[in-house]
Swiss-Prot record:
This is Bidirectional sugar transporter N3. Residues 29-42, 92-103, 153-165, 212-268 are cytoplasmic. It comes from Medicago truncatula. Residues 1-7, 64-70, 125-131, 187-190 are extracellular. One of its GO terms (molecular function) is sugar transmembrane transporter activity. GO terms for cellular component: plasma membrane. Mediates both low-affinity uptake and efflux of sugar across the plasma membrane. Forms homooligomers and/or heterooligomers. The keyword Membrane applies. It is a multi-pass membrane protein. Belongs to the SWEET sugar transporter family. Residues 234-262 form a coiled coil. Residues 10-96, 131-214 form the MtN3/slv domain.
Length: 268
């Protein structure tokens, strides 16, 4: 007996929900460290703002489409989780990073989303409204999937996969495959199309990982084998050490002085 398209769409959608659920929870360790250290440690808020914006758009699209319940479940969860991440970031970020986050949040997640709401509710009507919103979602998803191309270029240039973990590439490829299947059997090109690009780029990343996974180790071995030049003069080295020690002692004194002048409990 042949399996219906609705059954296959539900199966792929459920698997997509499970995998995307894990992807949304992946930054928990990062934000736990931020919470423990009370510092964002140079992390950027843009990826989480974009993820929230994407979840908001896909949730709105699913509500208008009315037959994409599994898109509603995962993107509702995504909106909640990404909002929590952003709140934690704002609490512990330095002033400049916090101000930039507020500006991006206002421009993208509030301003742009409000503009899309106005256009899709007053400028276009009926089936055209869903189509316009769908292609907006496609454009955003394509730009998000294309973002790791800079990492791909870095891997090819450095022949090292240090900044492209295999597990993440594999998970995102699997997620794109599941959502492509969901869109394909649901006969929704707006869901399926961007995930074709996502899967292709994911496979490319895994291929590069297989090619360059030993690149970093070879570079380290090469550095270890490089001959170490002996010091030209023990006398000169000793004199330099004395100068460095005197400089260090002077810097330590200045540092202690600076610490004593630092205001206690000053808000960032």
């Amino acid at each position: 007996m042949a399996i219906s398209h609705n059954t296959l769409a539900f199966t792929f959608g459920m698997l997509g929900n499970v995998i995307s659920f894990l992807v949304f929870l992946a930054p928990i360790s990062t934000f736990y460290r931020i919470y423990k250290k009370k510092s964002t440690e140079g992390f950027q808020s843009l990826p989480y703002l974009v993820a929230l914006f994407s979840s908001m758009l896909w949730l709105y699209y699913a509500l208008l489409k009315k037959d994409a319940f599994l898109l509603i479940t995962i993107n509702s969860f995504g909106c909640v989780v990404e909002t929590i991440y952003i709140i934690l970031y704002i609490i512990y970020a330095p002033r400049d990073a916090r101000n930039l986050t507020f500006k991006l949040l206002s421009a993208m997640n509030v301003g742009s989303f409000a503009l899309i709401l106005i256009v899709t509710n007053y400028a276009v009507h009926g089936p055209l409204r869903v189509q316009v919103l769908g292609w907006v979602c496609v454009s955003l998803s394509v730009s998000v999937f294309a973002a790791p191309l800079s990492i791909v270029a870095q891997v090819v240039r450095t022949k090292s996969v240090e900044f492209m973990p295999f597990n993440l590439s594999f998970t995102l490829t699997l997620s794109a495959t599941m959502w492509f299947g969901y869109g394909f059997f649901l006969k929704d090109i707006c869901i399926x199309l961007p995930n074709v690009l996502g899967x292709v780029l994911g496979l490319l990343q895994m291929l590069l990982y297989a090619i360059y996974r030993n690149g970093g180790e070879k570079a380290m071995k090469k550095e270890k084998k490089a001959p170490i030049e002996p010091p030209k003069s023990i006398v000169i080295e000793t004199q330099l050490e004395k100068i460095e020690q005197e400089k260090k002692n002077k810097d330590d004194d200045n540092e202690e002085k600076d610490k004593s002048e630092e205001p206690i409990g000053c808000g960032v």
